[in-house]
């Protein structure tokens, strides 16, 4: 199982000594050894690897990883190159097109966002193959809540995009007046028409970043 490194390791090191994390680690290791688990173990902490704490400008929260073959690689909503773009990400691209004029790309690989400071964080970091939410409640929520608390405490402006009720439940943890919190329904086909479409979160994010002297995000994912 890959390890967190860099400034995230320093920020979260207290968690690794907690009893819940020892239990979580043992559970996850056993699951990887005995079952098919996504994402691959080496991709588990990719959100933290691709977006160091000191570079985070935007946080997008997902729930648990995609659970079908070849999809999940440690960034919420993102899929590996060559994999069909999932429906929620199709809707994200549609809103980006309508909001910012981005063309809709032929892939769902969001590393470009992560490398610009968009933390793509699932609240549960692993899942059994073809069993959605199968690792809910084993301890990941406590760990990712700790990461959210670290982000809230940062003495600089960060945008939090909370899509859907599970993400919005984290709002109570976000009380730093420097941050911008934007809420909308989840981009899933079940809820996107209830207000995700038309939320303009991407342009609002960039307006906030620019107003605070930060580089805006280039949201355009290119064709491959």
Placement of each model-derived feature along the sequence:
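Short, contiguous pre-domain boundary segments
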Residues: 5-9
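A polyanion-binding, active-site-adjacent surface
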Residues: 2, 14-162, 166-169, 174, ...
